[in-house]
Amino acid sequence: KGIDIVFIGEGYDARDIADGKFERDCENGYNYFFAVEPYKTYKEYFNVYSVLSQSDESGIETVNTIIANKFMKNGERDVDAALLWAKKARADIDLTKTVVILLDNCEDYYGWTYMYSDGSAMSVVSISEEAYPYDFRGQIQHEAGGHAFGKLGDEYIYQNSYIQTCPCQCCDHPADEQSGGYGLFKALDWYKNLSMYSDHNMVPWAHLMFHPKYSDRVDMYEGAYMHMRGMYRSEITSCMNNNIPYFSTISRQAIVERIKEYAGERFDFDEFVAKHYDVMRKNKI
């Protein structure tokens, strides 16, 4: 049956659709999603759909006009409407195991993902024309591949401070692994690429740190989830840090575990190592 990915569009008017722009953007998004491991290896596990969604005007915003977008309500994203629209791909689609990718017809760089505790998720991705790695490719891989399906957390750093005491508004400032929105996702066994534990025996990637094939790369690196201190990641950099086309080892494992779970198959760590060790050699980051 396969795992479903559904592309829908925002800000594509009749001319954009007739000229094939929406189709081209969907095709590029599809190619980018499967251009990075482990999605490249497990591509046959997925079904990919695109559903036309015509807006009254082209684009997301301009200087002199208020754009009439399809999936907006009172100036906010109407996620419920977008998810309902995605079901047009197939009547029996299970949104709790589906990645919905809302393509914003805009060249500016931005993206975010709505993640819900039942597993449903929608990534909003602009058709960014910024330089690598902040291009459309980077957006698709980070938002849709990392957040929406992989259930991974952000590894980039905005604040040079401890996450528990920082006065910023960019996160929920968890006090520990069980608190805040961070703790909620951790309780769902998500965010496996992050940990607040400084003890290497307690982190989700503990089994990789002394593995002969990963010990030269996987370690404890402080700084993630927007903060320099108080949160740890497993590798120096990855797609969840700065959008490069490389997911860290624990991130790849989490993604493959989810693929296998949704497919009704058993995850085998030895099989994972055999298939994905070459990624380490190919990506000398």
Task: Please tell me what each predicted stretch does.
Residues 4-9, 47-50, 99-103, 123-126, ...:
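Structural recognition of the beta-strand scaffold that forms the well-ordered cores
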